[in-house]
A protein has these predicted regions:
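Flexible, gly/pro- and Lys/Arg-enriched active-site loops
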Residues: 44-51, 66-69, 74-147
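Active-site microenvironments that recognize anionic phosphate/pyrophosphate groups
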Residues: 6-12, 16
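Extreme N-terminal starter segment of soluble prokaryotic enzymes
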Residues: 1-5
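Short, surface-exposed acidic-centric catalytic microdomains
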Residues: 17-65
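Short beta-strand-to-loop capping motifs
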Residues: 8-10, 57-63, 113-116
Length: 147
């Protein structure tokens, strides 16, 4: 069984729904054993961007890293196109939309850790990820304290 720490994020107007849908998709590919729930974060790379919603999932899966990465990136691309089409008459079909303004991320799905190996060091040290890990750590202490 493999264990993945997956970070979801969006700052689009329909971002909360996009994150909820992504959680359901991720759950189809294994068992979610921990979940921060959605939490707000400030944009780190473009101060003009709207606030983000993020969520970290811990997934146990039989899939290998290549397969999980491929299906999450395929889902991400499909949903970004759908959201961009719905929200922008100019159709931003890239990773994000940036039309005369701030960067808007429809949905971002990143496998940050895989079986204890850090795959995305920049995400691992980012405030949005550290905040989620802090939430997960708090959940662990509540569960342990209840025992």
């Amino acid at each position: 069984m493999n264990k993945a720490y997956i970070c979801l994020g969006s700052n689009a107007p329909l971002g909360a729904a996009a994150i909820d849908a992504a959680v359901l998709f991720v759950a189809e590919n294994g068992s979610i054993v921990a979940d921060t729930g959605k939490y707000p974060t400030e944009p780190e790379y473009d101060p003009r961007s709207p606030r983000y919603l993020n969520r970290i999932l811990v997934l146990e899966t039989e899939l290998n890293l290549v397969s999980l990465s491929a299906i999450t990136k395929s889902y991400e691309t499909q949903k970004r196109i759908e959201v961009a089409t719905a929200e922008s008459s100019q159709g931003c079909f890239r990773r994000y939309c940036e039309v005369d303004g701030p960067k808007i991320v429809a949905i971002d799905i990143d496998i940050v850790e895989w079986n204890g190996e850090i795959l995305r060091p920049s995400d691992k040290v980012a405030a949005y990820y550290r905040k989620g890990i802090s939430i997960l750590d708090g959940l662990k202490s509540v569960v342990i304290g209840a025992l």
